[in-house]
Amino acid sequence: MTIKGGAGDMKTAQADLTTGPLGKQIFRFSIPLIFSNLLQVLFNMADVAVVGRFAGSTALGAVGSTTIFVSLFTGFLIGLSGGVNVLVAHHFGADDQKNLSDTVHSAALTCAAAGLVLLGIGCGFAGGILRALNTKPELMDGAVLYLRIYCLGMPALAVYNFGNAVFSAVGDTRRPLYYLSIAGVINVVLNLFFVIVCNMDVAGVAVASIISQYFSAILVTAALLRSRESYCLRFSQLRFHKTRTKAILSIGIPSGLQNAIFALANLFIQRGVNTFSATMVAGNSAATNADALVYDVMQAFYTACGSFIGQNYGAGKKDRIRRTFLISTAYAFGAGLLLGLGLLLFGRPFLSLFTTDPQVMDAGMYRLTVMSVSYCVSAFMDGTIAASRGLGKSAVPMVIVILGSCVFRIIWVYTVFAWFGTITSLYLLYVFSWTITAAAEIIYFIRIYRQATADLAAA
């Protein structure tokens, strides 16, 4: 990455993503993101491992029953921060200091407010939603308790994702990694303390999670407050700038809803899983940790795609937009393929991290066997969505996701799965929905890419 210097240069000590060899740049940019995402996954796995090994399969199933619901909320916040990332990248690439500062301060308030809203929804409706999902009666109390405590950390999660989006947009992927590492170590230590020493089971894991989330939010906020760059944060300048807030929401809300819709569709899948035994539910919960592991490694390349396209679009460099999309998608596909095959070969040792029950491990292998050869297909869908978002387009990709993933998956559950009634037939819907959605997203991206490059040529 090219590093610009000089007292008057806005990009001082930051990564310039508009020049240099793209293959090497995208890879180097993504490495800290991969480690950051992996750490987050590993720390979440530590939650499940501690519960599964020291609190039993019932506690493991209770925590696992909340996974989709937690993903719905966190997915919305991540999508909202994606709008922040795109706009900061655009203004940073265009060297537009005024709009950059206004975007940062509007985004800080917007994300914090979203976190508070989700806190209220999660705490107020946890029981009703879990009952609607046919959560097993023996898992209900633990699941409701875990979810209500976990949702207390939503404002912190929103603020951390805001800060992470800002730093990633300007090419700094290292600081969020450092902060997450510190918070993650705290999370693991507190997990062990609350569960083993204090015998708090699912409540202990949830409390440890929210403490670490607030710690990471404080660290990233402090870094923005200390910064002297144009993307710095100042409490005195916090306000909702109408045009900037509207721009953030126009990209962030569709992106957030898109992520939430995936989780919403998965609620129907969880409902299908819940029709099987408690052992199958626990095995599914253990195996879904593999999903997070693979998706979050691939997600690093999608983040890189959005940041690179955002800066280059802002700088008017159309030739690098297409190449960024192709390279980042190829990286994501390769990562999904390699990790999937690794899980296929080492599935049982992986599952043994979360449970010692042979029957639960057998149930987990059903999921790993199907999913391990399917993960790489999602690169074509998510990579294209990230590229469209980098060009400032997220509404149409959201509609495509609603139809290709949410609606399609619901139809699958009530037709194909209802007909065959096997867990394998339930898991197969992932690869089919990814393929259909990817085809539509690629067609749309080709259209907006041609329009964007034409606009840049005419400017």
Task: Go through each PLM region and give its residues.
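Short alpha-helical transmembrane segments in multi-pass integral membrane proteins
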Residues: 1-30, 88-155, 197-253, 309-374, ...
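N-terminal transmembrane alpha-helices
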Residues: 17-54, 68-83, 87, 112-119, ...
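Transmembrane helical elements of multi-pass membrane transporters/channels
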Residues: 28-47, 149, 183, 212-216, ...
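Transmembrane alpha-helix boundary and packing residues in multipass membrane permease domains
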Residues: 33, 37, 49, 86, ...
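Helix-terminus/linker motif at the lipid-water interface of multi-pass membrane proteins
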Residues: 42-61, 130-137, 193-202, 260-293, ...
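Small-residue-rich hydrophobic transmembrane alpha-helices
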Residues: 60-120, 157-176, 270, 283-341, ...
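Hydrophobic transmembrane alpha-helices of multi-pass small-molecule transporters
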Residues: 72-75, 187-191, 217-221, 293-296, ...
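Short runs within selected transmembrane alpha-helices of multi-pass transporters and secretion channels
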Residues: 81, 150-168, 176-184, 205-220, ...
